[in-house]
A protein has these predicted regions:
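Conserved N-terminal phosphate-binding loop of PLP-dependent enzymes in the Aspartate aminotransferase
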Residues: 1-290
Length: 290
């Protein structure tokens, strides 16, 4: 039996049974429906796009999946180079995973361990573990992603830990949070400009610009979760083109929705925080599918 997402299985209505999908349409036995939610915002080129279908068929004839543990291959190298070519600034270091939620987990692990590695090398530095996030945020359903999210409808059954502070998208609240917590703050994670599952809430670019200034002033890492907003959803290709984060998370439209895939992209500063002769400073994360 299938256990469906976000449903009370006892009372849920029978789902539409899809037998075919093409373009913007989903087909049942007797209906042609417009997929206005784009399979949770990932099918940006529509279903059965001939170029994407052909690419998958061509790759499958060679191999579908090879792990990156001790191995590499042309497709992942080409994808990484392509991302490096059109992402802004020095966002050049791509860590691949299988979903947006996992990519958020990787981003938070990067940020927290970045500080740990620095403290190893510089004992006079203070450990920083507090994470700043936004009210009404949604970053996924895995555990750390739930912690930085702020939606009781999704995550009411799980206790919040004390390591996250949520603020509204208002500059005075942002400045107050940095004034209060700057010596404890590790990172600030946001869905830039548009909060998706939290209610399609938009806010002004001035908030992000001020966040960048404060992060620079106090040595806090800025993380943009563009799983939903990336690839043109806000007008620009990425909000990161307007305000540059230290870590960028992409998913959903990354593959046009044809396979589950995501990437966490770090800048030079973050990557250098792991590049060391000390084996303990390696990023110890490795999804099967990446």
């Amino acid at each position: 039996m299938i256990w469906y997402p976000y449903e009370q299985m006892k009372t849920m209505k029978a789902p539409y049974k899809i037998i075919k999908a093409k373009g913007v349409h989903l087909y049942t036995e007797d209906q042609k429906l417009i997929d206005s939610v784009s399979s949770w915002w990932c099918m940006i080129h529509g279903y059965q796009h001939p170029e994407l279908t052909a690419a998958i068929q061509e790759q499958a004839a060679n191999f579908c999946h090879v792990m990156l543990g001790g191995l590499t291959h042309d497709p992942v190298e080409k994808l990484s180079a392509k991302l490096e070519g059109f992402l802004p600034g020095d966002l050049n270091y791509c860590f691949f995973s299988d979903s947006g939620s996992v990519a958020v987990e990787v981003a938070l692990k990067m940020a927290l361990q970045y500080n740990t590695n620095q403290c190893d090398d510089h004992p006079e530095m203070k450990k920083r573990t507090l994470i700043l996030a936004l009210e009404h945020a949604y970053h996924g359903d895995t555990f750390k992603a739930m912690e930085v999210g702020d939606d009781e409808d999704y995550h009411f059954a799980f206790d919040k830990k004390e390591g996250v502070v949520h603020i509204p998208t208002e500059i005075p609240a942002l400045e107050e949070a940095f004034a209060l917590y700057h010596d404890k703050l590790n990172c600030f994670i946001v869905e830039p400009l548009l909060q998706g599952a939290g209610g399609m809430r938009m806010y002004d670019i001035s908030f992000l610009k001020r966040a960048r200034e404060l992060c620079d002033e106090y040595g806090v890492l800025l993380i943009f979760d563009e799983v939903a907003t990336g690839f043109g959803r806000t007008g620009n290709r990425f909000v990161a083109d307007l305000v540059l984060p230290d870590i960028l998370v992409l998913g959903k439209a990354l593959t046009g929705g044809y396979i589950g895939h995501a990437v966490t992209v770090a800048n030079e500063k973050v990557f250098r925080g792991f590049y060391s002769d000390n084996e303990r400073h390696a990023l110890m994360h490795g999804p099967t599918f990446m």
